[in-house]
């Protein structure tokens, strides 16, 4: 990215997660240099200073999408939005950073997967990014590579799949080992929470019944499958006192499990996504196959139409914590790989461009949350959990100048005809959203303004993340100090101890005689 010019964002309402104030924001060398009133020098702007008028608008920290899959090779295809097109679309929606996933095959090297994803992303990204790394199998090699990734590669989060049997799924014992390792090295464990065994059996049942269309995808992965795995993951994480992050929370029942666990004091965070907050699974029964197929994702959207409203309420009240998109897009011809078998439809939907507007519409415009909570769930909480704060997720002196000038009264209609993503379908088609990004600034450079991009591939950069994020590990460390079980001190037992005798039955004795007679 070229050296950014000096910027003065003047007269807007600066919104952080904990307060709002009308103020000017001075940006220099890619970071916020000053925040206050009347920062414009007398006599007007000096040479080299560009003034952006934000009067009547909101000035927000750039969004952080915690969950994307750009150009992901999956289910026989590759997601159509690559790191260039996907991050460019993100900027147009007010998101200035994504966290993608490096996912090795079973038996593959985590470090090699990480380097592969870096080689794909670094030349293409238009905004800053980081990487989670998936643990798809377990061995001493995996254990050692996790440590190397944390110490040398800037990774502090690892994802485990409880679904996708025979592809990415790990066992409960492997979860226990991976969670234990995450805690040792100061990372946060993430899980895709679905019962993979039940899904596999459910899919066989649906196909045997002649159900081959997209509706079969949801029917074989009901809410209970997600809720059971969510509770199981929380139970295992609690057993080793490891912080846990549940990705793409899609159902009311799974969300309730997380909410209950948080109220019980568990260190667990839930991530609903734009799709689960903005639409529902009734689309799987649409008469147009391509329409239904474009909504197929895992876990699936839920057919209960009250689900988005329920999840938004929990998000507004801190039972759920962050928002991602699970942006993993496939065009219609790619989805058609499963035209005769729903298990072969590549899983994934859009969202990276529309997340901020959808959450504003469904959350703030509806009255469920205020502007500060919006900033928390779209940016700040993610920055805190993944140890990017206050460099990211806040407008403050010294923070990266990732900033969005937001028009809360403006509206836009979402459509595949006008969006900037490569995919030819949009699950939010026709939704009218209040809340529109007017200007997006990435590390001090105006990269999107009034529908025009000023960015090229490679302008973004990889952001390393350190382990032991205080936001999540302060409680973990204190619990280790004060809550570790200790033995009861008691006098040794000095009484009689019974002698165990071998119980040999008549049948056992006869069998033994036969074995001796017939060696």
Swiss-Prot record:
Name of a matching Pfam family? Amidohydro_1
Q: Which tissues is this chain's protein expressed in?
A: Liver and kidney.
NCBIfam families attached to this UniProt entry? D-hydantoinase
The subunit field of the Swiss-Prot or TrEMBL record says:
Homotetramer.
| Illness association | Dihydropyrimidinase deficiency: An autosomal recessive disorder of pyrimidine metabolism characterized by dihydropyrimidinuria. It is associated with a variable clinical phenotype characterized by epileptic or convulsive attacks, dysmorphic features and severe developmental delay, and congenital microvillous atrophy. Most patients are, however, asymptomatic.
Spell out the Gene3D superfamilies in the cross-references.
Metal-dependent hydrolases (3.20.20.140), Urease, subunit C, domain 1 (2.30.40.10)
Spell out which residues are annotated as carrying Phosphothreonine.
Answer: 510
* First-level EC class: hydrolase
Instruction: Locate the Phosphoserine modifications and list their residues.
Output: 79
Q: Give the cofactor note.
A: Binds 2 Zn(2+) ions per subunit.
> What's noted about post-translational modification?
Carboxylation allows a single lysine to coordinate two zinc ions.
Reaction it catalyzes? 5,6-dihydrouracil + H2O = 3-(carbamoylamino)propanoate + H(+)
One annotated Gene Ontology cellular component of this protein: extracellular exosome
Please list the residues that bind Zn(2+) 1: 67, 69, 159, 326
Location of N6-succinyllysine modifications:
256
Residue positions where N6-carboxylysine is found in the record: 159
GO BP, sorted A to Z: CMP catabolic process; dCMP catabolic process; dUMP catabolic process; pyrimidine nucleobase catabolic process; thymine catabolic process; UMP catabolic process; uracil catabolic process
Query: What's the family?
Result: Belongs to the metallo-dependent hydrolases superfamily. Hydantoinase/dihydropyrimidinase family.
The cofactor required is: Zn(2+)
- Record keywords, A-Z: Disease variant, Hydrolase, Metal-binding, Phosphoprotein, Zinc
Under Enzyme Commission nomenclature, its number is 3.5.2.2
Record has Lipid biosynthesis as a keyword: no
**What protein name is recorded for this chain?**
Dihydropyrimidinase
Residues that coordinate or bind substrate: 164, 347
